[in-house]
């Protein structure tokens, strides 16, 4: 029974080992998932080196190796399991081993002084010395000392030979890296035009500090000058106010004689309808103004086009002078309250609106004329018919007489309501996108 159980356990363990050998260690242990957000994209050289590491068994690390290999490595460094109830016993054994290891350590030091070829064991091997018995899968004891004696010297020699080669290689790599770094630093300095020596750097810093100090002093001086100027201005204003107040007291009624030649006023209309000029010196004459009437939009447009053609025929300098003159004239007329019609776009819009209104009124007038003519003709017919009925009814009894027709009123034309109600903008605009 025990043999069959052992066989089954071995089979199961070998199956699990096979599965672990297929799983990469980085997915099984997942130690780098905590620092995953710090991950950066590998360069082409790094990815190439990783591929080479996978193929080379000496350069393989925990990322490239399988889960089984990592587990075996951890088993080598693992400490022995303490069974429950044997903790104190284990502690006593450990103290005894520590005491013996101290004595052995002293003897080993003496041996190293006498014989330099003998190599001291590593810390991991010292921990392995504490374990005297190791069990295999079947439960059989394997003595550790015999195994240790066979493997220890070869490993130490290999390590020593590797370290010497590595030291030489490291020195070469360090020298190459230093030379590269120096070259890069010098290249960057030349690009940003940095000063070469330390003295030049210090001189540049001093120069910058001096410039800053000079700027600060200049700004302070400007502020002081502004303050002095503001104080002097305030003193001048105070003195002017005092002088003005004295003059007012002296002159008295001479305020009415203030010269208002340079002052322009807007359109001022009196109760009787008379209007004053912009300088308030005289009344404005209500004479007939030159040019077309206010509502004659077409004439205004023609006048504007003629003026534009005349302006285009002149030189550039004359055009500029004329425009400046017209600008002032326009401002003066607007100040007087005269409406100026010199916007071509608005004039054309007004003409278009007036023409549309004319067309609409023409249609309404023709419709009204037709209705009036129809009513006149219908009334005439009705009258003639009533006269005929009246003639026919003579000599007949009342119950046999034909009734007279009523007076023709005409078709009721729907009256338009007062006010503007707008229209529904449902139809598409003419000439719009189809």
UniProtKB/Swiss-Prot annotation:
Start and end residues of each stretch annotated as Disordered: 32-257, 375-434
Compartments, record wording: Nucleus, Nucleolus
Coiled coil: 162-230, 293-360
Annotated Basic residues bias: 393-408, 425-434
Subunit structure: Component of the 90S and 60S pre-ribosomal particles.
Family affiliation: Belongs to the SURF6 family.
Official protein name in the record: Ribosomal RNA-processing protein 14
UniProt organism field: Saccharomyces cerevisiae (strain ATCC 204508 / S288c) (Baker's yeast)
């Amino acid at each position: 029974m025990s043999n069959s159980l052992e066989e089954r356990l071995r089979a199961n363990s070998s199956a699990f080992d096979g599965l672990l050998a297929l799983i990469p260690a980085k997915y099984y242990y997942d130690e780098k998932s905590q620092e995953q957000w710090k991950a950066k994209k590998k360069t082409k050289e790094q990815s190439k080196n990783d591929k080479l590491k996978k193929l080379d068994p000496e350069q393989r690390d925990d990322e490239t190796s399988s889960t089984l290999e990592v587990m075996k490595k951890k088993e080598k460094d693992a400490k022995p399991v303490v069974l429950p109830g044997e903790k104190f016993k284990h502690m006593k054994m450990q103290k005894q081993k520590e005491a013996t290891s101290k004595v052995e350590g002293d003897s080993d030091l003496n041996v190293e002084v006498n014989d330099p070829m003998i190599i001291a064991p590593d810390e991991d091997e010292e921990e392995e010395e504490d374990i005297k018995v190791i069990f295999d899968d079947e439960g059989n004891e394997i003595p550790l000392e015999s195994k240790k004696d066979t493997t220890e010297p070869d490993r130490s020699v290999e390590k020593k030979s590797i370290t010497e080669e590595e030291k030489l290689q490291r020195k070469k790599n360090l020298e190459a890296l230093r030379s590269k770094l120096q070259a890069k630093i010098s290249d960057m300095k030349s690009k940003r035009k940095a000063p070469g020596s330390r003295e030049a750097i210090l001189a540049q810093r001093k120069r910058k500090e001096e410039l800053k100090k000079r700027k600060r002093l200049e700004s302070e001086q400007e502020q002081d000058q502004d303050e002095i100027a503001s104080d002097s201005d305030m003193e001048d204003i105070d003195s002017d106010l005092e002088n003005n107040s004295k003059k007012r007291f002296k002159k008295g009624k001479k305020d009415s004689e203030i010269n208002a030649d340079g002052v322009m006023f807007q359109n001022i209309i009196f109760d009787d309808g008379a209007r004053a000029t912009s300088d308030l010196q005289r009344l404005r004459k209500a004479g007939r103004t030159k040019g077309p009437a206010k509502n004659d939009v077409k004439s205004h447009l023609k006048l504007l086009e003629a003026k534009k053609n005349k302006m285009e025929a002149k030189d550039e300098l004359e055009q500029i002078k004329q425009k400046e003159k017209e600008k002032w004239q326009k401002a003066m007329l607007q100040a007087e309250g005269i409406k100026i019609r010199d916007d071509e776009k608005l004039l054309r819009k007004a003409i278009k609106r007036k023409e549309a209104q004319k067309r609409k009124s023409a249609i309404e007038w023709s419709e009204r004329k037709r209705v009036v003519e129809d009513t006149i003709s219908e009334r005439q017919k009705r009258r003639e018919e009533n006269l005929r009925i009246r003639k026919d009814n003579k000599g007949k009894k009342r119950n046999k007489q034909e009734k007279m027709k009523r007076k023709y009123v005409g078709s009721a034309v729907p009256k338009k309501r007062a006010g503007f109600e707008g229209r529904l903008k449902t139809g598409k605009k003419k000439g719009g996108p189809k």
